[in-house]
């Protein structure tokens, strides 16, 4: 590899690296000073990357709860059928700072089993 080619490659890699670093949304958008716990029936569940999600209606409000990635869910014993629509669960989490219908979930209790997601 010539010096010019190497410099070009390194410049390209450096230019693309910040995009990869911010591609994941992170958890900074959730207010950890306002934790809550709710119990309800799962209306819909999504078991795919980047994060699994469940939707529930609590006291007339429709919520979207962001869970862990599928690989972590599987390692902790939470399979798609465990969080399927129609199941009842309890979640503990933090509300999103700008989306009032979304929350990040720290742990879920389903089928009598408490599972830490972070």
Per-segment meaning from a language model:
Residues 6-10:
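N-terminal export leaders
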Residues 22-34:
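Short boundary/loop segments of OB/S1/cold-shock single-stranded nucleic-acid-binding domains
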Residues 40-42:
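Conserved hydrophobic positions within beta-strands
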Residues 49-56:
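Short aromatic-glycine-enriched beta-strand elements
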Residues 75-90:
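Short nucleic-acid-contacting surface segments enriched for D/E, G, S/T with interspersed K/R
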Residues 97-118:
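OB-fold/S1-family single-stranded nucleic acid-binding modules
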């Amino acid at each position: 590899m010539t010096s010019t080619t190497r410099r070009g490659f390194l410049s390209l890699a450096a230019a693309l690296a910040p995009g990869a670093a911010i591609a994941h949304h992170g958890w900074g958008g959730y207010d950890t000073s306002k934790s809550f716990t709710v119990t309800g029936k799962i209306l819909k569940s999504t078991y795919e990357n980047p994060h699994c999600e469940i939707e529930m209606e609590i006291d007339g409000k429709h919520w979207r709860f962001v869970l862990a990635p599928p690989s972590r869910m599987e390692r902790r014993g939470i399979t798609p059928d465990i969080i399927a629509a129609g199941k009842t669960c309890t979640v503990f989490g933090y509300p999103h700072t700008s989306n009032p219908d979304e929350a990040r979930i720290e742990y879920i209790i389903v089928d009598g089993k408490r599972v830490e997601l972070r």
